[in-house]
Amino acid sequence: MRSIKLVFLFLILTVLKVAAQHEGQTYIPDPDPLIQKRIDNWQDIKFGLLMHWGPYSQWGIVESWSICPEDEGWCVPDTVKDYFAYKKHYENLGKTFNPVKFDPEKWARAAKDAGMKYVVFTTKHHDGFCMFDSKYTDYKITGKDCPFHTNPKADVTKAIFDAFRNQGLWVGAYFSKPDWHSSDYWWPHFPPLDRNVNYDPAKYPDRWNNFVNFTHNQVMELCTNYGKIDLFWFDGGWVQKQVAPVGEAPQASGFSVKKAFNQDIKMDELVTKIRSKQPEAIVVDRAVEGKNQNYLTPENMVPGKLLPYPWESCIIMGGGWSFSYNAKMKPSRDMIHMLADIVAKGGNLLLNIGPGPDGTWYDEAYDRLNEMGAWLKINGEAIYNSRPVAPYVDGKLRFTKGKDGSASIIYLLAENEKLPSEIQVNGLTPEKGAKITMLGKKGSSVKWKSEGTGFKIVVPDALSKAAPSKYAVVFRISRVVL
């Protein structure tokens, strides 16, 4: 029992540490007015889908990390006796990956119906397996060794991007800067020691330059062959120009980045190339402070307070980032509350689903998305095109403002809870004569009265007993004093 308490305490302290890191980070805006405008547009759409998918889904394991020789719980499994044999077995997963039930149009419809406005897909994760048709490697889903390569939708990145664009969603390319399959990153001359390049780029500059060129070439394939891409989401923050002494530095996800060498991937140059083909593209160079990190990405957590810069929480719906057998999904109530909490603090929610090895989603994922969509159809006015407004968060209340001078108060309902007859609101004042209505109920104007430092909403008994939406209710104020 004591050990369980210690583990629980460790997890709590880790979450607090990660939250503190995000709340204290420096944000450097992109100087381009066009990109600033696109970021503002992105802040309007609020809710997106992230998908981690690759051959690793066949084993139901954490994506890529099980071949990383680090002493971390998400890396090489304890059961592995021969690392190199295991790595070879892992790399052969592409030879049996055959997701014949892949239906991107079904995914796109489900995402749209859920109220999602953008998608980010893993075109390549750290293991280097390409889910797009790159001519710079044979380690790809369209390669002749992969049984799916003869399928008309073998280029799954293209199929996904086309399907989601057709439903009106933005599309984003997740791309891993490290590539553990590339002999120019993990050089077979040396054994890999951790997530980093396994040789000194300063000592072997030609090899490192080969890797930089390889990376740039693959990214430019995505820029030129896959239509308009709204977001480039670069992962692997340890691959960056070294500006501090070699050692460890905190990464946005909360663990330490073991930066063994200067790994200058020439990101400024790469972003210039991207924008020459995709002038409106938002670039997120995750966990690398600078103008190429157009917004910040707290990982699998929600910051404790308003953050004064563009940000997005990427959060797992259930299981892991990638598909896992017998995954347990988060309850719909929790996810709707989480979305409201994130938006009230100025962020976007990027909700992750890991497709299975046959190309399908969990049935429960569709159920959760249906419920989120039903809630947003009624209450989306409080979410989309909104911005945070003080007091942001107060107990069960979350606050947002519209661009028309209105404001929304989101009341988070606990399980089996009915709305109280009166709701005290502090720190926000309606204008004189302002009307308050409950979204989802026509003619549901409610009375309010000034009280203390705020006001009190009087909820009619009929509305309390029959709220128009489950999980959370929204009160819209026509005008507020700002």
Describe the predicted segments one by one.
Residues 1-23:
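Bacterial Sec-dependent N-terminal signal peptides
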